[in-house]
Amino acid sequence: MSWKYDVVVVGAGIAGPIVARNVARAGFSVLLIDKKWAIGTPKQCAEGISIKVFEKYDIPYDKRFINREIYGAKLYSPSGYELEMRYKDVSGVILERKVFDKMLAYYAAKAGADVLARTEALDVIRKDGKVVGIKAKHEDEPIEIYADVIVAADGVESTIARKAGINTYAPPHEFDSSYEYEMLIEGFDPDLIHLWFGNEIAPRGYVWVFPKDEDRANVGIGINSDNPQTAKYYLDKWLKENNIPAKKLLEINVGVVPVGGFVKELVKNNVLVVGDAARQVNPMHGGGMAEAMEAGTIASKWIVKALEEENLSLLQNYTKEWWETDGKRLEKVLKVRRVTEKLTDEDLDLFIQVLSGADAEKIAGGDYGEVIKALLKHPKVLMSKRRLSLLKSLL
């Protein structure tokens, strides 16, 4: 069995449905496929996202996939110093990813795209040396899907990007391992997300509590994947040390997060790679939903232009525009990440004491120049050659 579309999108996480919806809206035939039996499961995410994405990426603010509105964040240092960022208005939400992802695919379908769950991409189809489609299986039946443009939105492992000749390789140390419980938990302000830092708490990462209800939250951890201990070990250790019983677990999720850099060439002829498949993730906190939406938006713009003008070479502009915009920002964030990996617990204590909430937000977003300059004037920074050197490396 074979089908023909203008565009086939492999993967219905975040980036894939955004691309499929936008291209279908422009009047082109699109097929969005996902290997899972139910789009959106299992989740591999803490489910928090900025309130700004709904308007920016034209996504309905639908209470069906919003668990809780969030008004800020609270950061905790290794010794227990706290930094709170609290806003009058809603700053973010905790999603229900199992519903959210499915609704993104629904919006793509409503825009005109065909959507098929339980359809796994296996390989690319080549003709005269060019990629002309993909081999897949739909409900265990082999199919061939021919398309002018193929979009690899198939996650960190990205079979299709690799098969098409896009270099997506990254060494193991450029990934973090995550482990998360959705569980009943009390004693934390449910209007804030909570983050704990420390080299003994979460090496190269942090522990999070993202409230989904008054007494229910995603409680998870991210650590360097080459750590001799597992993420589960550190999370269970943190729960025990904080006298938090782990006896009311509603869901357990594990994941791998690319945090060490981004795929350089995002296009190979008529094949594009987006989202986690392109490692388009904020390396500071490991979140990638907003980044996937941005990449999907840029990619879909150039797909539409290339198809309208019947000039697939225009697809190369996706790589160019992404690196000039979000890629440039994320490279700055990666620079911060690499510095934070060298911080001692004493450093983390100091910075959480002296930074304001606005400062912390700027650093996490890559807009840190003025904040670093101010820190360089702090007496405890001036007295340490090592701290001075680390901070100056960011300027």
Curated annotation (Swiss-Prot):
Catalytic activity: a 2,3-bis-O-phytanyl-sn-glycerol 1-phospholipid + 8 A = a 2,3-bis-O-(geranylgeranyl)-sn-glycerol 1-phospholipid + 8 AH2; 2,3-bis-O-(phytanyl)-sn-glycerol 1-phosphate + 8 A = 2,3-bis-O-(geranylgeranyl)-sn-glycerol 1-phosphate + 8 AH2; CDP-2,3-bis-O-(geranylgeranyl)-sn-glycerol + 8 AH2 = CDP-2,3-bis-O-(phytanyl)-sn-glycerol + 8 A; archaetidylserine + 8 AH2 = 2,3-bis-O-phytanyl-sn-glycero-3-phospho-L-serine + 8 A
EC number per UniProt: 1.3.-.-
Residues noted as binding FAD in the record, renumbered to the chain: A15, D34, C45, A46, G48, R97, A121, D276, G288
Pathway participation: Membrane lipid metabolism; glycerophospholipid metabolism
One GO cellular component term noted in the UniProt record for this chain: membrane
Binding site for a 2,3-bis-O-(geranylgeranyl)-sn-glycerol 1-phospholipid: R329, G365
MF GO annotations: flavin adenine dinucleotide binding; geranylgeranyl reductase activity; oxidoreductase activity, acting on the CH-CH group of donors, NAD or NADP as acceptor
Cofactor(s) required for function per UniProt: FAD
Short name of one Pfam family: GGR_cat
Keywords associated with the record: FAD, Flavoprotein, Lipid biosynthesis, Lipid metabolism, Oxidoreductase, Phospholipid biosynthesis, Phospholipid metabolism
Source superkingdom: Archaea
Cofactor note as given: Binds 1 FAD per subunit.
GO biological process: glycerophospholipid biosynthetic process; membrane lipid biosynthetic process
Function: Is involved in the reduction of 2,3-digeranylgeranylglycerophospholipids (unsaturated archaeols) into 2,3-diphytanylglycerophospholipids (saturated archaeols) in the biosynthesis of archaeal membrane lipids. Catalyzes the formation of archaetidic acid (2,3-di-O-phytanyl-sn-glyceryl phosphate) from 2,3-di-O-geranylgeranylglyceryl phosphate (DGGGP) via the hydrogenation of each double bond of the isoprenoid chains.
Note: Reduction reaction proceeds via syn addition of hydrogen for double bonds.
Family assignment from sequence similarity: Belongs to the geranylgeranyl reductase family. DGGGPL reductase subfamily.
Name assigned to this protein: Digeranylgeranylglycerophospholipid reductase
Source organism of the structure: Thermococcus gammatolerans (strain DSM 15229 / JCM 11827 / EJ3)
